[in-house]
Amino acid sequence: MICFMRKASVVITLCFFTSFSQAAELNHSREYARCMGLAPSDPNDAYEMATAWKSMGGGDAAEHCAAVALYYSGKAEYAARRLEVLAETIIATPEFKGEILGQAGRAWLSHGDALRAEATLTEAAKFLRGRPGILVDRSEARAALGDYKGAVEDLTNAISVDASKAEAFAFRASAYRYLDELGKARADIEAALILEPDAAEALLERGILFRLAENKDAARADWLKVLELDPDGEAGRLARANIEKMDVNVN
């Protein structure tokens, strides 16, 4: 549910190559774009590229790409640690430090350390002054810690700034469900699906709400749709598990 590189890529590119003399030349800018573009699809090659580039003066930009490559290679803990160090040592604007910390927090979430993620994202939020994306990410960390009221607070604040994102409504619906506020959960999930009718996370959550209301046919329909939309993702995995659990309970 977390997009590691969302929102920040343009800001990061501009900041690296307007703020740091060691990476100010055009060839470094091209290396950064190449390295970051390679990281999601071939993280091992991107990491090797970043390491070699850093030895030739790539500086903080090369270090950033190395950390991102570690994340995409499944080494989220190492990525998070390097991103935290980078955010601490880099000479940059507060907003840019916040972007790097936000990526570190998302990496901690992927690693499964919700406590560290919540702390890191809280620090990022101080720099980013309540930017909605950071609040949505921190809400997920808080929910993982069982702090559903805190998650609702973050999501409500995020929605008050930008009410156009289906995921914020879907996540808040889930938090409301855990707080046993099912009416609010249903209202949020319908809002999410108005914004994005094929949002897998929202359909997954609506299916859960249907199951709680004993409407098993509707629940199954939503979960089967999730499997069509996201067969190999986390939403698909959870939809499959819910169908299997429901079938076992029926039998």
Regions found by a protein language model. Name each.
Residues L212, R220-N251:
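Terminal, low-structured helical/coil segments at or just beyond the last alpha-helical repeat
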Residues S21-R81, N251:
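N-terminal leader/linker segments that initiate helical-solenoid repeat arrays
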Residues H28, D60-A61, P94, G98, ...:
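Helix-start (N-cap) detector for alpha-helical repeat units in TPR-like alpha-solenoids
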Residues P40, Y72-S73, R106, S110, ...:
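Register position in tetratricopeptide repeats
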Residues C35-M36, V68, R106, E140, ...:
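Residue-level recognition of tetratricopeptide repeat
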Residues A52-S55, E88, A92, A125-K126, ...:
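Conserved structural position within tetratricopeptide repeats
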Residues C65, Q103, D137, F171, ...:
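Canonical tetratricopeptide repeat
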